[in-house]
Amino acid sequence: MSNQAVANRYAYALFQLAEEKSILSQVVQEMELVKEVVNTTPEFLQLLSHPKVTTEKKRAFIENSFKDSLSETSLHTLLLLVENKRIESLVDMIDSFKEMSYEAQDMAEAVVYSAKPLTSEEQAQIAVIFAKKVNKAKLLVTNVVNKDLLGGLKIRIGDRIYDGSVKSQLDRLERQLIAGTR
């Protein structure tokens, strides 16, 4: 079975449990914390996937690392991944879980690329306008500054990209000019 299929199964089980206990939002935040730890500390997954480290030591490491910051549900999920030797699916599982929970809450994530930082008011306006475009009740906006855009915005929501950047407009114009001179 592929890592993604394994990740989806664990994500679905976690989603059902969190929804049943009415702690979906809390578990999403906890899983984001775990993902941040994994992304900023590569040794974390290296230790948990190392074949010479015993399962007991891995369990103790997870419990000591997260006992104060994770709910029993989230902690148990991590321990289950370790016990079943599926920890390599952790990041994919977190991503799948977030997708499922956002879908259930009629939400989506949007990454907004801009040449300069956006104010919270601008981000809120983008959230309202684009939530309607993608038929969602709420849009969670993350602003990423990319000076190469020169101006305008590039917005990624799921697999959709809305590109209104000056750079893309100049690139389009350049292609049209080159095509016209042939």
From Swiss-Prot:
Which membrane topology describes this protein?
Peripheral membrane protein
Cross-referenced HAMAP family, in alphabetical order?
A: ATP_synth_delta_bact (MF_01416)
Q: Which subcellular locations apply to this protein?
A: Cell membrane
Positions of disulphide bridges: none
Q: PROSITE patterns annotated for this entry?
A: ATPASE_DELTA
Asked if the keyword DNA damage belongs to this entry, the reply reads no
Q: Which UniProt keywords apply?
A: ATP synthesis, Cell membrane, CF(1), Hydrogen ion transport, Ion transport, Membrane, Transport
A GO molecular function term, named singly, is: proton-transporting ATP synthase activity, rotational mechanism
Q: What is the taxonomic lineage of the source species?
A: Bacteria, Bacillati, Bacillota, Bacilli, Bacillales
Could you state one GO cellular component term attached to this entry? Answer: plasma membrane
Q: What is the role of this chain?
A: F(1)F(0) ATP synthase produces ATP from ADP in the presence of a proton or sodium gradient. F-type ATPases consist of two structural domains, F(1) containing the extramembraneous catalytic core and F(0) containing the membrane proton channel, linked together by a central stalk and a peripheral stalk. During catalysis, ATP synthesis in the catalytic domain of F(1) is coupled via a rotary mechanism of the central stalk subunits to proton translocation.
Family indicated by similarity: Belongs to the ATPase delta chain family.
The UniProt record lists the keyword Cell membrane: yes
What do we know about how this protein assembles, alone or with others? F-type ATPases have 2 components, F(1) - the catalytic core - and F(0) - the membrane proton channel. F(1) has five subunits: alpha(3), beta(3), gamma(1), delta(1), epsilon(1). F(0) has three main subunits: a(1), b(2) and c(10-14). The alpha and beta chains form an alternating ring which encloses part of the gamma chain. F(1) is attached to F(0) by a central stalk formed by the gamma and epsilon chains, while a peripheral stalk is formed by the delta and b chains.
> What name has this protein been given in UniProt?
ATP synthase subunit delta
